[in-house]
Amino acid sequence: PSTSAPAGVLNAVQNIMMRDRMGYTDAFGIPRLRQRIARHYHEQYGVDVSPDNVMVTTGSSGAFILSFLASFDVGDRVALTSPSYPAYRNILAALGIEVIDIPVDIEINFQPNVEVLSRAIETAEGKVDGLVIASPSNPTGTMLGPSELSDIVTYCHDQDIRLISDEIYHGITYERPAQTARAYGREMIVISSFSKYFS
């Protein structure tokens, strides 16, 4: 994340700027870019994604704001692991959405599982409308394994909980490749980021 943009990207931007080819793009992003992102999901994860289901935003923070606005109403309740990325909580609070904490610790690799998730939701006493997961996690760097991720996707589907999967750190893994939640279902929002993945 602290490196500069690749030379090829800088050169392409310079060429576009010099040719004065600036202007508005499609609201969901440049079609060729959306097609390439869909192809990336097929090449990297073996998952077929339609370019129609790809939206390009100005950074992942913009994606989180738009995803939360599209998925939740004022007064809805969204579960987050504790610890988790502080901006989730701040954005949700600004939108009038209640945060339900899911305590996680080293014993469960600082990641939720269905048992912990069920217990947190029961303790919350009432409907939980959403869940945000991050694998790899910020701040802990831990990842969900394929079976854990699959179980969470199934649980959210069965409980009618909107799942948002933060996958912006997929380009920074060490022991094993990260899995996308999209491999286990279609009814979620997956957020990724160029600045982390391709840095």
Model-inferred region functions:
Residues 1-59, 66:
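N-terminal small-domain helix-loop-helix segment of the aminotransferase-like
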Residues 48-54, 74-77, 186-187:
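Short acidic capping loops at alpha-helix termini that bridge into adjacent secondary structure
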Residues 70-92:
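Conserved PLP-anchoring active-site segment centered on the Schiff-base-forming lysine
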Residues 76, 97, 158-162, 186:
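A short helix->loop->beta-strand "cap" motif at the edges of active sites that frequently abuts
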Residues 80, 101, 163-165, 190-192:
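Hydrophobic residues in well-ordered beta-strands that form the structural core
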Residues 94-100:
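A short helix-loop-beta submotif of the ANL/AMP-binding
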Residues 104-175:
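Active-site phosphate-binding strand-loop segment of PLP-dependent enzymes
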Residues 176-198:
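Conserved active-site segment immediately N-terminal to the catalytic lysine
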